[in-house]
Amino acid sequence: MSVKGITPQELAAYGIHNVSEIVYNPSYDLLFEEETKPTLEGYERGTLTTTGAIAVDTGIFTGRSPKDKYIVRDAITQDTVWWADQGKGKNDNKPLSQEIWSHLKGLVTEQLSGKRLFVVDTFCGANADTRLQVRFITEVAWQAHFVKNMFIRPSDEELARFEPDFIVMNGAKCTNPQWKEQGLNSENFVAFNLTERMQLIGGTWYGGEMKKGMFSMMNYLLPLKGIASMHCSANVGEKGDVAIFFGLSGTGKTTLSTDPKRKLIGDDEHGWDDDGVFNFEGGCYAKTIKLSEEAEPDIYHAIKRDALLENVVVLADGTVDFNDGSKTENTRVSYPIYHIDNIVKPVSKAGHATKVIFLTADAFGVLPPVSRLTANQTQYHFLSGFTAKLAGTERGVTEPTPTFSACFGAAFLSLHPTQYAEVLVKRMQAVGAQAYLVNTGWNGTGKRISIKDTRAIIDAILNGEIDKAETFTLPIFDLAVPMALPGVNPDILDPRDTYADKAQWQEKAEDLAKRFATNFDKYTDTPAGAALVSAGPKI
């Protein structure tokens, strides 16, 4: 079957003219040739490493640039988007006028016109009924490689029928000189137009802007159809039982969802519709800082030919120093999901989730290692999206720093957070799913809860043992905590027992409870949010 390809006339419809050549859906072998051409300069050039993977640099942008994110405010988005300039909550959805959008689009199309372009057609979403058909247009070979890794790769038959319903034009080489007069944050921009169904990128080379841009769009489109859109990992057991894991960076989401007894559905972005849980992506985007074969063998072995390393330090002999964070701590690798052996095949989807796990790394030492949540507590803790880090100082004094990120992914939410919470709980109630809050952080001993105990807790959740356990109610937070679980040290289940002086727990718990309440205040501007206050801690 012949693949349809794309004509210069189609690109002209987007405003891109006089293209010298279109490289359509290039193979991995062709991309390898293209990104290692000796004539390439600067951030376009890829370096072959001894792993077989290509390494690239993304310049000053080694992460997303949330302050440069904009959405066109028009008739479609006016009353639906969670705007940065409305309500109590702070977010990155800054409004953009149609006039400035047209100016930015002109900059990007001018940058791409007259060039040799890579066009990659992909799917975002493993479920054919709700997926986005996304067309990426770029002049940089490795950016085409990145989206081929990260999104779902259509078959030749699917490409023959491909009709894009979202266009991403990456003009990383262009910037906006008029940003000051236009009242924008900087010369760089990541802008979205939901009426035109288009994303524009200018000034930043970071690959993750394309990945997370489409996640933000799925986060807009799906919940409005009653489909949950989630920043989580997901896996499935031998009996078809599905678990989803929410958690911010450093809480153990990737580690705990990688389980030899269960198959991985995906590691980062999922939807939940009438058929079940499905991955948005066709690849993984893993952190590589301090990566070792012993600690994370799956990721380590996935770094081979066709993988793409970002911002790692490559030595003169082509070896990668994963311990060197001199460019950024956010070193990454993207690879197609089939580089991991233990995955759901051929399509990254499964049935309905019965276990929903919220991971938190509580550095305050207050929360229990595990608790069962009621429906209202599920919404409350989902909206809170709490974790905390220990910030060290010279004298070894460690003050915990709390982080609250709505729905465990505030940066990517396009609608008000309560809409995601409502859709998630509806999906859970329809199938009788249960949520659990799992603390992978610290307790009164000053030590982190052991990975052995945490894995035993996850096992008890997945095999149902936790639902048979007797529970007690932890005061202030009103959480149902099991009194004993197989394979878990019984001395840690009640966090108060880990303190030599229980009054210390009380003091810390009251402090943390106040922080929860202060954070949650921003949701009380909607009736749905105000109704959940009683599910939070009592001060």
UniProtKB/Swiss-Prot annotation:
| Database matches in InterPro entries | PEP_carboxykinase_ATP, PEP_carboxykinase_C, PEP_carboxykinase_N, PEPCK_ATP_CS
Q: Does the keyword ATP-binding apply?
A: yes
Q: What class of enzyme is it?
A: lyase
- Signal peptide start and end residues: none
Q: Where does Mn(2+) bind?
A: K212, H231, D268
Cofactor(s) named in the record:
Mn(2+)
Q: Spell out the PROSITE patterns in the cross-references.
A: PEPCK_ATP (PS00532)
Gene Ontology CC entries for this record: cytosol
Positions that bind substrate? R64, Y206, K212, R332
A Pfam family recorded for this sequence: PEPCK_ATP
SUPFAM superfamilies attached here?
PEP carboxykinase N-terminal domain, PEP carboxykinase-like
Spell out the reaction equation it catalyses: oxaloacetate + ATP = phosphoenolpyruvate + ADP + CO2
Subcellular location per the Swiss-Prot or TrEMBL entry: Cytoplasm
Annotated ATP binding lies at 212, 231, 247-255, 296, 332, 448-449, 454
According to UniProt, this protein's pathway is: Carbohydrate biosynthesis; gluconeogenesis
Q: Which GO terms describe its molecular function?
A: ATP binding; metal ion binding; phosphoenolpyruvate carboxykinase (ATP) activity
Question: Which function does this protein serve?
Answer: Involved in the gluconeogenesis. Catalyzes the conversion of oxaloacetate (OAA) to phosphoenolpyruvate (PEP) through direct phosphoryl transfer between the nucleoside triphosphate and OAA.
- SUBUNIT field: Monomer.
Similarity remark: Belongs to the phosphoenolpyruvate carboxykinase (ATP) family.
What the entry lists under HAMAP family is as follows: PEPCK_ATP (MF_00453)
What's the protein name?
Phosphoenolpyruvate carboxykinase (ATP)
Which organism does this record belong to?
Yersinia pseudotuberculosis serotype O:3 (strain YPIII)
